[in-house]
Amino acid sequence: VVAEQDRPQSTVINWREHPNVVSDEEIIEMVHFAQSLGLKVILKPMVNVSDGTWRAHINFFDTDVPCEPKWSEWFASYNEFILHYAKLAEETECSIFVVGCEMVNADRREKEWRDLINEVRKLYSGLVTYNCDKYQEDILKWWDAVDVISSSGYYPIDKWEQELDRIESVVNEHNKPFFFCEAGCPSWEGGDLLPNDWTLRGKADVNVQKEWYEKMFSTTVKRDWVKGFALWDWKAHLY
């Protein structure tokens, strides 16, 4: 479920009656359909910025300044958004609920995230995770607050082993399950070296994508602590 805020420093998240946000009825229908097929469902509310800025750049001063937007204002709106979908996740018996995705600058607001997770647990009885961005697994300070560690697995094809070594140390430290809540590679030349950069364009090459996925799966299958993947949807209209 993707909501939007107007700019990186906006403090209001537009999710009620927004034309780009799917309705609760649509979510319920799709969750029940997936479950009827025997699938387990992860509900993942996300925030995008309407002007195209990546959500990792949502940021405010650490110390409140008069007449400037504040973290407290942003989290008030974000919490309302997340708690609505936590309740929906409980009602539809989703297996995992994701409290946030790739909010790199917001990650440092440890107290706000811990408080939010505590409120989520009052509404939702399933597994709770946070989807940190690539390279942030060993930087996030509040993994103890969630049930499952998850991250975005957009690593260069020749770096998988060393990145898995780094992530493994985090998993061992916290003794929690781990999965890639996002992972993928676009099917264009050069995509295997910068799979996270959706702004790049190159000649279409499905073998680039195929070899990247083969590398990801062949390296992670040897790591029994990697419990699974949620694969990103690369849309054909990009070409």
Residue ranges and their predicted role:
Residues 82-101, 132-161, 176-177, 181-196:
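Aromatic- and acid-rich polysaccharide-binding/catalytic face
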Residues 23-27, 78, 82, 113, ...:
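Aromatic/hydrophobic pocket-lining residues that form the small-molecule binding cavity
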Residues 1-12, 25-106, 190, 234-237:
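Substrate-binding cleft and catalytic face of glycoside hydrolase catalytic domains
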Residues 11-17, 190-239:
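Aromatic-rich peripheral "rim/lid" segments of glycoside hydrolase catalytic domains that contact
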Residues 42-47, 96-108, 114-138, 175-183, ...:
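Aromatic-lined carbohydrate-recognition surfaces of secreted/lumenal glycan-active proteins
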Residues 28-40, 90, 113-125, 168-175:
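Surface-exposed amphipathic alpha-helices with a cationic face
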Residues 6, 18-22, 75-79, 104-110, ...:
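Acidic-and-aromatic substrate-binding clefts and catalytic sites of carbohydrate-active enzymes
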Residues 16-25, 65-78, 199-211:
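A short acidic, glycine-rich active-site loop
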